[in-house]
Regions:
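Active-site-proximal alpha-helical segments within enzyme catalytic domains
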Residues: 252-259, 311-333, 397-413
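Active-site SXXK
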Residues: 151-176, 199, 256-260, 320-323, ...
Length: 435
């Protein structure tokens, strides 16, 4: 009888604790689970038929040999871009500031992700100090990841383009974020005379012109970066805006990047150096991919940045953190660029892919954002009243900034196969790393 009473009491305690944990963690509880690799310890696998092994499909769970193969492929792709004149580079000025770094606190599940999972770089910055600085241990991959390793930003580069737009406005190259697009190159397209903010907010009414998944323009078989913006403008000739819903796509931000080059004109290189060298103070060279020249060499604009710029940056882990810190300081200090960031936050629109309860929602940061504007995500579930800004790039190249508490998480990863709640959202929400 006493045993039954003890079991009953113990069950009540467990029920009470579980219920309270559930209430305390009704959202964003996260998971420490390391998603199992396909054929761990096996040979490398090449997905698809692309010549360069650059990026995995999001659904794949590659093993370490495959991750190594794709890192080699990225390096080969970088070299090919550079040798063919399809890369724009900004050299460091030698004025980078060294981060203050403290000893990593114990975080068993984060360590496990770095040793067996898909996170390749994890930086947690707290009030001027890197509190966690994590990369896989030497020897895990064919090439060790270090502070010189270049990563694609993917769509996080869209947010960097927006940050450059802010600088272009503050330096007078662009009159305001509401400036009508008056660009001869795009004068016969749907973008003509639209306010720039429409393009920044991804509600330019261009859903009928772009294949969302394949980044193809007007049914073209070629990827949009395999043609310059003269060719793209010809494909778009005669198009008109349809609707004002958010249509998230890759083509539009490259058009914005090239618009900045058009407005800055001969000062374009000067503008980029001001942003990356003088403001961000990069430590290593930063690159971005250029659209291929496909128009006639007799074209007046042939080869110029305004027909070739893109958001596809290649940057080191430390310099991506420097980008985030620069954004945070501008915002906090209410500089001209900081006020631009505040304005796009105020004018952000409802994000149509807010779905925190969806199955596997935790694999994507954007599932927890309620607002999108100026190529940033805002208003995160359970943190709506806080000034938090985030970026998200394919396969986990992400930034989240807590403007109120000076905390930043920057990640680079190999695959879409880890819990964004545990390693990003929770860290910003609670201000501490997972145990």
């Amino acid at each position: 009888m006493l045993t039954k009473y003890f079991v009953f009491c113990f069950s009540l305690v467990v029920f009470y604790q579980t219920t309270n944990i559930s209430k305390a963690c009704s959202f964003n509880c996260g998971s420490s689970h390391v998603i199992t690799q396909k054929d761990p310890g096996g040979p490398a696998t090449k997905y698809g038929n692309r010549y360069f092994t650059v990026e995995f499909p999001e659904k794949e769970r590659p093993n370490d040999a495959t991750i190594s193969l794709y890192e080699d492929g990225r390096r080969q792709f970088f070299s090919a871009l550079k040798s063919r004149g399809n890369m724009y580079s900004i050299k460091p000025k030698g004025n980078s500031e060294t981060f203050k770094v403290s000893k990593n606190p114990q975080s068993t599940i984060l360590d496990k992700q770095l040793s067996k999972g898909y996170i390749l770089s994890y930086l947690y910055y707290d009030n001027g100090t890197i509190k966690y600085n994590g990369i896989p241990k030497p020897g895990r991959f064919k090439r060790d990841i270090d502070d010189k390793t270049l990563f694609f930003t993917h769509s996080t580069g869209k947010s960097i383009i927006s940050y450059i737009v802010g600088h272009a406005i503050c330096k007078g190259y662009i009159s305001s974020k509401n400036e009508p697009i008056n660009w001869p190159l795009m004068s016969k397209t749907l973008y003509n005379e639209q306010p720039l903010i429409n393009l920044l907010n991804m509600n330019a009414g261009d859903k009928h012109t772009v294949n969302e998944g394949a980044s193809r323009v007007m049914g073209s078989k070629a990827h949009h970066r395999d043609m310059d913006h003269i060719t793209i403008a010809k494909l778009l000739q005669g198009t008109e805006r349809k609707g004002n819903d958010i249509f998230y796509n890759n083509v539009l931000t490259d058009i914005v990047a090239s618009y900045v080059a058009f407005r800055a004109d001969n000062d374009y290189d000067k503008l980029l150096k001001m942003v990356f060298q003088d403001k961000i103070k990069i430590e290593n060279e930063v690159h971005f991919e250029l659209h291929r020249n496909t128009s006639s060499i007799s074209e007046k604009l042939y080869g110029k940045p305004q027909i070739r710029a893109s958001y596809s940056f290649m940057i080191t882990r430390g310099d991506l953190l420097r980008v985030a810190v620069s954004m945070m300081k501008d915002y906090q200090n209410k500089t001209c660029v900081g006020n631009y960031l505040r304005d796009i936050q105020k004018q952000a629109n409802s994000w149509p892919k807010y779905r925190p309860s969806k199955k596997n929602a935790s694999l994507y940061l954007h599932n927890y954002a309620k607002k999108y504007g100026g190529k940033f995500y805002f208003k995160f579930n359970q943190m709506e009243d806080r000034n938090i800004m985030a970026t998200e790039g394919y396969n986990g190249q992400n930034i989240m900034i807590d403007m109120d508490n000076s905390k930043i998480v920057v990640t680079q990863s190999a695959a879409t196969a880890w819990d964004q709640r545990t390693f990003i959202l929770n860290v910003i929400r609670y201000g501490k790393l997972p145990k």
